[in-house]
Design a protein with these regions (language model features):
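Intrinsically disordered, low-complexity segments
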Residues: 2, 17-18
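Alpha-helical and His/Cys-centered functional microenvironments
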Residues: 11, 30, 148
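Bacterial N-terminal signal peptides that target proteins for export
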Residues: 1-9
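N-terminal, motif-rich segments that launch catalysis or mediate targeting to/interaction with membranes
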Residues: 19-135, 139, 155-265, 269-312
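Catalytic Zn2+-binding segment of zinc metalloproteases
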Residues: 144-159
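Bacterial N-terminal signal peptides
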Residues: 8-17
Length: 312
């Protein structure tokens, strides 16, 4: 069966959409979040900046070996009704009573995972090891960053229901890869978060409010772009692959009024604030004095299992 160039491009773009926010963006977020921290805790994070940067994408890599991982990166709010989705109990145990755990897992559990990882990070800072702190700091940073992405709040996560396949990688990978060097990374100091679960829900809802604009602007840019102006064929390492043209990426970024930069900035502040808050709740320990010992797993997370999706 023959396929058109456009169909081929869409297929390749779908296969390329394999990492939330894009590895480049996640690593940038974690690195920049360190500079939001107060002087009493920043030395530890600065000493381990490279390690933390590399761990920023570990949660995405786990999706290929851990069947419980995928559902932690998103929540399909559209399957629950309309904004502000007041029919979803914000607390996990209440939500399980209404929808059952299997239903919640099938629709994504992102805000609850952020809250569980927060508790893990508090434990790690209080009585864990340096390894534990780095693991949970990286993981909670990854999840809260995913919560800042509009396409992580819908079942139409890659435009597959609106004839916009590939939009996920376009929004969260291609745009930051092309423009991150021009971004303003001054996002202020980390703030103490009283209620991490409420904080996670608020960010998810903020992201969902941007979903219509995310989809509609891509449609408009596509409509005014010539047929051969959206995709290009590239050759690298002897292999042919498709990619959005730099002109299309630029047009879409402009149409979004720098939405991607703003959500990345929000991610940086959120990551730093969660790290800082966990440190406060742990009693402001000297993290450099932590010893090495085996991590204690979070029992709640062990119980979670969900099939992988192509791109979360």
């Amino acid at each position: 069966m023959k396929i058109s160039v456009t169909q081929y491009c869409l297929l390749i773009l779908t296969l390329l959409a394999i990492s939330s926010w894009g590895f480049h963006a996640h690593k940038t977020i974690h690195t920049q979040a360190i500079f939001t921290l107060p002087i009493k805790m920043s030395p530890f994070f600065l000493d381990h900046a490279h390690d933390l940067k590399e761990r920023a994408v570990t949660a995405d890599k786990r999706r290929y070996t851990d069947t419980t991982e995928a559902c932690k990166h998103y929540i399909d709010l559209d399957l629950y009704g309309i904004y502000p989705f007041e029919n979803i109990p914000r607390k996990w145990f209440n939500a399980k009573e209404v929808y059952t755990k299997d239903t919640l897992k099938s629709r994504g559990i992102l805000p609850w995972v952020i809250n569980w990882e927060y508790k893990n990070l508090v434990w790690a800072m209080d009585s864990g090891s340096k390894e534990d702190v780095l693991k949970h700091a990286a993981d909670i940073g990854h999840y809260i960053s995913d919560a800042n992405v509009p396409l992580h709040t819908t079942s139409n996560y890659n435009g597959q229901h609106s004839n916009q396949k590939g939009i996920h990688a376009l929004w969260e990978s291609r745009i930051p890869e092309n423009y991150s060097e021009t971004y303003d990374y001054f996002v202020g100091k980390a703030q103490y978060i009283e209620d991490p679960l409420e904080f996670a829900w608020n960010i998810v809802l903020e992201s969902n409010l941007l979903l219509n604009e995310t989809l509609e602007q891509e449609k408009k840019v596509t409509e005014r772009t010539r047929k051969d102006g959206k995709y290009k064929m590239d050759v690298s390492n002897g292999k042919v692959h498709s990619e959005y043209t730099s002109e299309f990426i630029a047009e879409y970024n402009f149409a979004l009024s720098n939405m991607v930069e703003r959500r990345l900035q929000s991610s940086i502040n959120a990551v730093g604030s969660l790290w800082y808050s966990a440190w406060i709740d742990a009693g402001q320990p000297n993290l450099n004095l932590l010893k090495t010992k085996k991590e204690q797993p979070n029992k709640e997370l062990i119980l979670i299992s969900s099939p992988n999706r192509i791109h979360e």
